[in-house]
Amino acid sequence: MGPPGNDSDFLLTPNGSHTPDHDITQERDEAWVVGMAILMSVIVLAIVFGNVLVITAIAKFERLQTVTNYFITSLACADLVMGLAVVPFGASHILMKMWNFGNFWCEFWTSIDVLCVTASIETLCVIAVDRYIAITSPFKYQSLLTKNKARMVILMVWIVSGLTSFLPIQMHWYRATHEKAITCYRNETCCDFFTNQAYAIASSIVSFYVPLVVMVFVYSRVFQVAKRQLQKIDKSEGRFHSQNLSQVEQDGRSGHGLRRSSKFCLKEHKALKTLGIIMGTFTLCWLPFFIVNIVHVIQENLIPKEVYILLNWLGYVNSAFNPLIYCRSPDFRIAFQELLCLRRSSAKAYGNGYSSNSNGKSDYMGEASECQLRQEKESELLCEDPPGMESFANCQGTVPSLSLDSQGRNCSTNDSPL
């Protein structure tokens, strides 16, 4: 990146006037800058708006305040910081073709960039472990991962991410020793991230590849267990249905005691698919950059600078995708509609299970409080085999009963907010 005003940047006629070719080139450059500025502004707005919406929804609606969604909040915070403190300065760097914020902010900005990516991948890794425990050890899950423990885990994720991002950069452990890099470090208008080979490889492994391998391994195990559960549900659904019909005849009350284990299981597996899409999207967006990041320090001239920047921005765009993916969840869709005032009436909002409480928060009410109380009273664990068999492969979690209140309304609720 040459300094502005270099004579090679334009053509002059003998009398000092611009040639038509130069005018055309200048117009194209201006159009490119305007187009890129609009595109980058849209990306920043999408990242900030979407993740503020996610954080607000989880904070306001008690129905969404689950342990898993605490981790989702951490992920949204990382994306929000990316949209506020990283992407705008990266856009300025590209559009202005120089760095205008000094050496200190250059290194600090780079540290925040690494922090957000590291915190995101480590949070996704924690979510994978969270789902693995939930689906393989449902009896122990609530004691192993309480909300307070989830907060501690999130704090540890950010501390570790901060140490692995800020410490090497602020201590200048990352710096290369060749002449081009040293010139850039001394130039306040240059913020190209020249790194030595050891730092590039070590930081990529610690901040990305190790958490990625753990995440993929754990989540593949989660889907294997989930697949076995679906197969067992398919085989046993008829037995559950016939047992519950007999109970209805004995009780003499239509609909009371009818269990919907398959419905619950499908909701749980849809939640797993949503989380899988989030992890897959993150991997697809960031993996190419981290591959190029290592190749670049081994063979600098092999990867064009434009490709490096493009793949870096592909990673940035990932921060705008997650709020769109969350819309797969009915609970998040309802919460977003409530926050954006897109619901036609308050009656419809109540019918979908959200209302405001005395503290100004909103919670999921089901059809009415009577339904909620009845559901809490009648929910239980349904086991396919006698106790002592393998954990959740035999028991289908806490399955709400499909019961009716005094007015004949359905009292079932969705136990999978995501």
From Swiss-Prot:
Sequence motif PDZ-binding, location on chain: 415-418
Gene Ontology cellular-component terms listed: early endosome; Golgi apparatus; plasma membrane
CDD domains assigned: 7tmA_Beta2_AR
Short name of one Pfam family: 7tm_1
Membrane-spanning residues: 35-58, 72-95, 107-129, 151-174, 197-220, 275-298, 306-329
Region Disordered, annotated ranges: 1-23
Lipid bilayer topology: Multi-pass membrane protein
Residues modified as Phosphoserine: S246, S261, S262, S345, S346, S355, S356
Subcellular location: Cell membrane; Early endosome; Golgi apparatus
Chief location category: membrane
Disulfide bridge map: C106-C191, C184-C190
InterPro entries tied to this protein: ADR_fam, ADRB2_rcpt, GPCR_Rhodpsn, GPCR_Rhodpsn_7TM
Lipidation feature positions (S-palmitoyl cysteine): C265, C341
Protein name as catalogued: Beta-2 adrenergic receptor
Organism for this UniProt entry: Tscherskia triton (Greater long-tailed hamster)
Gene that encodes it: ADRB2
